[in-house]
Curated annotation (Swiss-Prot):
Domain of life: Eukaryota
Lineage: Eukaryota, Metazoa, Chordata, Craniata, Vertebrata
Record protein name field: Uncharacterized protein encoded by LINC01600
Length: 127
């Protein structure tokens, strides 16, 4: 199921720190936000700015959302490695699976084949 993007416009974004998402198993690291490594890339969501800080998605407490790659460390040692930030394509599994796609997002430090991130040729206008 793909949720409307409006669902995420009210998610509390934090600037200057890395946050892990919350899961039923406790605080589990999950890079809901990853940098776009392309200079001048446009943020996919309102409120995301060019920054040298790390942005992470803080999922709603009790949501039961668990990332498909629980081995991602937190906090990320690579915060600030890119010029612009946006949501990558990622999938949550659990009681309420969903996926979010954005424009050709290329994660900086999640490069293994097991990564939950996928490159998508979807423009911001698609939202």
């Amino acid at each position: 199921m793909i949720y409307p993007l409006d669902l995420f416009r009210n998610i509390p974004w934090k600037q200057g720190k890395c946050f892990a998402s919350l899961s039923p198993e406790g605080e589990r690291a999950f890079d809901g936000m990853e940098p776009l490594c392309q200079p001048g890339a446009r943020p996919a969501l309102r409120g995301l700015q060019h920054a040298s800080d790390c942005y992470r998605l803080l999922s709603p407490p009790g949501s039961g959302l668990v990332g498909t790659n629980p081995s991602v460390p937190a906090p990320s040692p690579h915060c600030g490695c890119c010029q612009a930030w946006s949501i990558s394509s990622f999938t949550f599994t659990g009681p309420t699976p969903f996926k979010i796609n954005s424009d050709q997002a290329t994660p900086c430090h999640l490069r293994s084949p097991e990564t939950i991130f996928r490159q998508r040729e979807i423009s911001n206008e698609a939202f």
